[in-house]
């Protein structure tokens, strides 16, 4: 919610409202963000080449193992993404209340929808003055849940289902994700949806990076530096 609705009420409310810096993101959350960002880049690049392999190279296989290294990097980054996501879910329970914003979208609150519409208008250059937010703004929160949370879960489930084919029947991946391929119909269908999911996340990353840079420049609070140092820096002391 907007800054004035995010702060506690009381005698010291006005003083708190005028703070120009608030500690928002704890170290584990920031570490997760950048590790996840790196893993998504690795997954995107290696996944593209897995979907469109390089031309066959003549000679001994041991001397031409590039695709093998690419697949290994893809699998390793997939583990990092999945394990990191589980750690992020854990931190939502033990971290501060900002750590829960990624998973708990307050769609039941009328004020949230009002501010969501304000953010849509702001991003479309129809609002002259943006609001101040300590955590995610409503549009950012909704986008993170719809694109990242749902996208990461989908890619992890379909990815490990395909990984299970290589590990074989009876493997841990087959026992946990063997139901996915029959659900989609066949292995190729899962490959196709997994490939489309990659582009889904690529589009999200492009929009996310653009809007983060845009907000850092034209909004009333820091964004990129907040995910580095944890502190949200405000450019003015007005509460709204």
From Swiss-Prot:
One Gene Ontology term from the biological process aspect of the record: respiratory electron transport chain
**Pfam families per the record?**
Ni_hydr_CYTB
How this chain sits in the membrane, per its record, is:
Multi-pass membrane protein
Q: Name one GO molecular function term.
A: heme binding
Keywords recorded for this protein, A-Z: Cell membrane, Electron transport, Heme, Iron, Membrane, Metal-binding, Transmembrane, Transmembrane helix, Transport
Q: Where in the cell is it found?
A: Cell membrane
Q: Which InterPro entries does the record cross-reference, listed alphabetically? A: Cyt_b561_bac/Ni-Hgenase, Di-haem_cyt_TM, Hydrogenase_cytochrome, Ni-dep_Hydgase_cyt-B
Please state the protein's primary subcellular location.
Answer: membrane
Any Gene Ontology CC annotation: plasma membrane
The residue ranges crossing the membrane are: 31-51, 75-95, 142-163, 196-213
Protein family (similarity comment)? Belongs to the HupC/HyaC/HydC family.
Give the protein's biological function. Probable b-type cytochrome.
Q: Cite the NCBIfam families for this sequence.
A: CytB-hydogenase
Q: What is this protein called?
A: Probable Ni/Fe-hydrogenase B-type cytochrome subunit
């Amino acid at each position: 919610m907007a800054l004035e609705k995010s702060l506690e009420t009381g005698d010291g409310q006005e003083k708190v409202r005028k703070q120009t810096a608030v500690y928002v993101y704890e170290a584990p959350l920031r570490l997760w963000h950048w590790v996840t960002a790196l893993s998504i880049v690795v997954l995107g690049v290696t996944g593209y080449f897995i979907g469109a392999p390089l031309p066959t190279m003549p000679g001994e296989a041991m001397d031409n193992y590039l695709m093998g290294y690419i697949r290994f990097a893809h699998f390793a980054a997939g583990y990092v993404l999945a394990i990191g996501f589980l750690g992020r879910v854990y931190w939502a329970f033990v971290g501060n209340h900002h750590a829960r914003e990624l998973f708990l979208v307050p769609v039941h609150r009328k004020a949230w929808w009002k501010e969501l519409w304000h953010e849509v208008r702001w991003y479309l250059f129809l609002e002259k003055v943006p609001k101040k937010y300590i955590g995610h703004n409503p549009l950012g929160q909704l986008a993170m849940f719809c694109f990242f949370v749902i996208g990461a879960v989908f890619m992890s489930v379909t990815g490990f289902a395909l990984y299970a084919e290589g590990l074989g029947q009876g493997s841990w991946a087959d026992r946990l994700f063997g139901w996915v391929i029959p659900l989609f119909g066949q292995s190729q269908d899962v490959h196709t949806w997994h490939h489309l999911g990659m582009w889904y996340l690529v589009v999200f990353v492009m929009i996310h990076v653009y809007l983060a840079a845009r907000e850092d420049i034209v909004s009333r609070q820091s964004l990129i530096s907040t995910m580095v140092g944890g502190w949200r820096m405000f450019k003015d002391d007005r509460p709204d």
